[in-house]
UniProtKB/Swiss-Prot annotation:
Taxonomic classification: Bacteria, Fusobacteriati, Fusobacteriota, Fusobacteriia, Fusobacteriales
Gene3D superfamilies the record matches: N-(1-d-carboxylethyl)-l-norvaline Dehydrogenase, domain 2, NAD(P)-binding Rossmann-like Domain
Protein family according to the UniProt entry: Belongs to the NAD-dependent glycerol-3-phosphate dehydrogenase family.
Pfam families recorded: NAD_Gly3P_dh_C (PF07479), NAD_Gly3P_dh_N (PF01210)
Example GO biological process: glycerophospholipid metabolic process
Protein's recorded name: Glycerol-3-phosphate dehydrogenase [NAD(P)+]
Function in brief: Catalyzes the reduction of the glycolytic intermediate dihydroxyacetone phosphate (DHAP) to sn-glycerol 3-phosphate (G3P), the key precursor for phospholipid synthesis.
């Protein structure tokens, strides 16, 4: 029995804890919020972030980080991307050397453009952690119910990747492996920005044609920027790129799409965030993506317009119109 602690008590953290518990492992969940931890202990569910999905009674819940981390074989970091650095700093003095850490947050740090695993390794370098990433088209609402789902795990070495594949995989949760950590993380971060665009189109009551165009041209932007940042192009057309993009653009489970819908309906950014009432990772990743595109000289017109709607109060319909009247282009640069 492997001892695992899930650091973060949001929907994704709870869903993964339930999954890993089903796989026969010993589970602890850590919550930053003492009140939320007490509610989880009593009600065995997070009624706000993942309602009606119950934690087994033998999954331990704590708000004490040292208690959560002590003597654990694996730590799963399931906190929002903006909290990865602060949580990593908090782990610095309490984790063991060579601790296995699996990041499941999706995002890029705004100022540095670092991936989540880059941040973890930077903050914990003195402990030489074994860091990996798990990503893919995987809404917590479905994983928590055992609905068939596929993901990808990636680490710096094949041995750790295969070990974690066995830890997470079961008949309802199929895990593939990849050597491309950079591509896996960038795909997971940037798809949230395109999902905001898809939601905006839905909020404007545009149709399936528009959605198909945004997904297809969106994955082109993701892959172009991702390759420039060091990822492999094939990764962006797999589960952690195109697969994650499709589910995030199409599903009502997607908080990024829901936020986009509200923006398309004329709500302000603050109003949309308040109504979604969960972290909308694409908002943070949008700024990072724009910074990265300027750094690497990559054209990302959809992501540029999303930034304009988010941070410059640009009218959503006007943003879509500007995408449609851009200069004529080849679809694929092969002529």
């Amino acid at each position: 029995m492997v001892k695992i602690s899930v650091i973060g008590s949001g929907g994704w953290g709870i869903a993964l804890a339930i999954l890993l518990h089903k796989n026969g492992h010993n589970l602890t969940i850590w919550s930053f919020d003492k009140k939320e931890a007490e509610e989880l202990k009593i009600n065995r569910q997070n009624k706000t972030k993942l309602p009606n999905i119950l934690l087994p009674e033998d999954i331990k819940v704590t708000d004490n980080l040292k208690e959560a981390v002590d003597n654990k074989d694996i730590l799963v970091l399931a906190v929002p991307s903006k909290a990865i650095r602060s949580v990593s700093k908090s782990l610095k003095d309490i984790i063991k050397d060579n601790q296995i850490i699996v990041n499941v947050a999706k995002g890029l740090e705004e100022d540095t453009l670092k991936t989540m695993t880059d941040i973890i390794e930077e903050e914990l370098k003195e402990k030489n952690p074994q860091v990996a990433v798990l990503s893919g088209p995987s809404h917590a609402e479905e994983v928590g119910k055992g609905i068939p789902t596929t993901c990808v795990v990636s680490a710096h070495n094949k041995e750790l990747t295969l070990y974690l594949q066995n830890i997470f995989m079961n008949p309802s949760f199929r895990v593939y492996t990849s050597p491309d950590m950079i591509g896996v993380e960038i795909g997971g971060a940037l798809k949230n920005v395109i999902a905001l665009a898809a939601g905006i189109a839905d909020g404007l009551n545009y149709g399936d044609n528009t959605k198909a165009a945004l997904i297809t041209r969106g994955i082109k932007e993701i892959s172009s920027l991702g390759v420039a940042m060091g990822g492999e192009q094939s990764t962006f057309y797999g589960l952690t790129g195109l697969g994650d993009l499709i589910v995030t653009c199409a599903s009502m489970h997607s908080r990024n799409r829901r936020a986009g819908i509200l923006l398309g309906q004329g709500k302000t950014l603050d109003e949309a965030i308040k109504e979604v009432n969960m972290v909308v990772e694409g908002i943070y990743s949008a700024k990072s993506a724009l910074m990265a595109a300027k750094k690497y000289n990559v054209e990302i017109p959809i992501i540029e317009q999303v930034n304009a709607v988010l941070f410059e109060n640009k009218n959503a319909a006007e943003a879509v119109n500007e995408l449609m009247i851009r200069d004529k282009k080849l679809e694929i640069q092969s002529w």
